[in-house]
Amino acid sequence: LKMKKKIEKLRNHGTMTESGFWGMIRSALRQKSRWWKPITECKQKSKRAYTGNNKRQKFEYKCNVCKNWFPDKEIAVDHIKPVGTLKSAQDLPKFVENLFCEIDNLQTICASCHLIKTKKDKITHE
C-alpha cells in the first residue's frame, strides 16, 4: 500500500504553511483582545492592593478557581466557554465572536488552574 503524501497549501510566496498562516491570524486576534474592555474590566474586578513584603508589587488578583491571590504575571483572564479553534476561514466568525465576548463569559484564573482547565477543554472539544 502506498500512502499519498498530502500536499499542504502554502501562503506568503511559499514561505508559510496553512497552519502557520492561521496561527499568525489567531495570535494577532488574541493580542488585540487584551484591550477589549470586558477583559480589562474582569481583571480589575479581581484586583486588590498588595500588602506583602515585595515593594515592587502593588496589586494582586484572585483566582476564580482555587480562590488564592497571585501577582499580575501569574494570572490570566480566561474564557469560561472556550474560544475554540481557528484552523480555516470557516472557523473565523465563531472564533471572533467567542474571543470578543462579554464579561459574563470571563474569569480571572491563576496559571496552574488555567493549565488544567485548558487541557480539559482540549480533550472535551477535540
Language model regions located:
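Histidine-centered nuclease catalytic patch
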Residues: 68-106, 123
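Short flanking/linker segments adjacent to small metal-binding domains or redox-active Cys/His motifs
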Residues: 116-124
